[in-house]
A protein has these predicted regions:
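Extended Gly/Ser/Thr-rich low-complexity repeat segments
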Residues: 90-106
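Short, Lys/Arg-rich flexible segments
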Residues: 1-89, 112-115, 119-173
Length: 173
């Protein structure tokens, strides 16, 4: 962008107005790009979460079943945050249990170590199967759940698409 002006009050004022208009276009582009990337990230993370399997409950016959779960992804703070909501979000993202996720410090999720994910309770991960009591007072046996990583996988995918998304947003202005 080139702006030519003379050293006169009116010419300088016109140049300043041109710059202010350009600044508004840049701010709109930044906001539109941020929102578009955030919405695509949320949409793809939701698709991955919807196809995830959660839990591995073992029934009395030894059959393994997946549990129902809630994993809702939304955009917040004017596109500055993509948030996953639900009671099972951490388990779906990072996994639970030594059976699927290995010994302490060997989580399949690349960011787990930074968040102290992958440590185990009193038994230190010695048991591949454990039980908990459900809302009906019944013991449920489980191996835990493998790290599905919908947020992390979506981030990797969308990050590679940012140049193309930026071009699409710029062309739409």
């Amino acid at each position: 962008m080139n702006i030519r002006f003379e050293l006169s009050k009116d010419s300088i004022k016109a140049a300043v107005n041109t710059l202010k208009a350009y600044q508004k276009r840049v701010e709109k582009y930044e906001r539109d790009l941020r929102l578009e990337v955030a919405h695509r990230l949320a949409e793809y993370a939701q698709q991955l979460a919807d196809s995830a399997e959660y839990g591995s409950v073992i029934d009395d016959e030894g059959n393994v079943h997946s549990l129902p779960f809630t994993f809702d992804v939304s955009v917040a703070n004017d596109g500055r945050l993509v948030v996953a909501h639900g009671d099972e979000v951490a388990f779906i993202e990072f996994g639970a249990g030594v059976y699927y996720n290995g010994a302490v410090g060997t989580s399949p999720h690349p960011k787990a170590g930074n968040l102290t994910i992958g440590s185990y309770g009193k038994g230190k991960g010695a048991q591949e199967t454990w039980a908990y009591m459900d809302e009906n007072g019944e013991f449920v046996y489980t191996h835990g759940t493998i790290a599905q990583m919908p947020m992390y996988k979506a981030l990797l995918s969308i990050a590679q698409q940012v140049p193309r998304i930026a071009k699409e947003v710029a062309e739409s202005l």
